[in-house]
Amino acid sequence: MNYKTRIIIGVVIALIAVVSYFMKTDENPVTGEKQKVSLTVDEEIALGLQSAPEMIAEFGGEYPDKKLQAYVDRVGNKLVQSTEAGSSPYKFEFHLLADANTVNAFALPGGQIFITYALLSRLKSEDQLAGILGHEIGHVINRHSAEHIAKQELTQGLIQATDIASGDPGMISRFVGNMVNMKYGRDDELESDDYGVKYMVQAGYKPEAMIDVMRILKEASGGGNQPEFMSTHPSADNRIEKLKEVIAKYKKKQ
């Protein structure tokens, strides 16, 4: 295949990928926002339920102390029932994972939310736990996973196009992938911080605890944050400053 043919095929594949991405638009059932997503709400829920057992196994299973699991459930359900999340189509379930070494919390599409014992054991208050769970609920409500899947499909299409058209596909493919996905991660974390604070306030928790959570996470990472521009997540210090602004915003609305 000569160079001109490769370029033409690459352009066609890229155009198909871009057009397909921009045609995947749906209205968020909670926020009303128009979003580019690949999954319906029902598909999000099904994917989350299907993937949950694998995630549980990956982090050492469920934590055996049922009282601690009940504590996580109580805080999570209070957040859901006190906010718009309770009237959303998502069925939230909260999982305490047995992993005592990995400090982590995350959400799968459709309402499956996880926190490791390693993270829970570092928290000093119910308000801090509410901050973490509220943040993860924010990811679900804003359909970040569904948006991410749509962007991955776009990225894969562009990668295929550059692989065909470029003489150095590896470098260009990685560049395309990084540029498409970098802003997505940064924006979503800040948006979920915002929603986490809002849900904390609505459920009667102290939103300042989110700042304490950021400091705990920073300490757990050894303070070794990557330079913010090259990270998919804002730095802990940047998030703390943004959180102060968000907390002030929602306190004014009380």
Predicted regions and their residues:
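A Zn2+-metalloprotease active-site environment signal
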Residues: 1-254
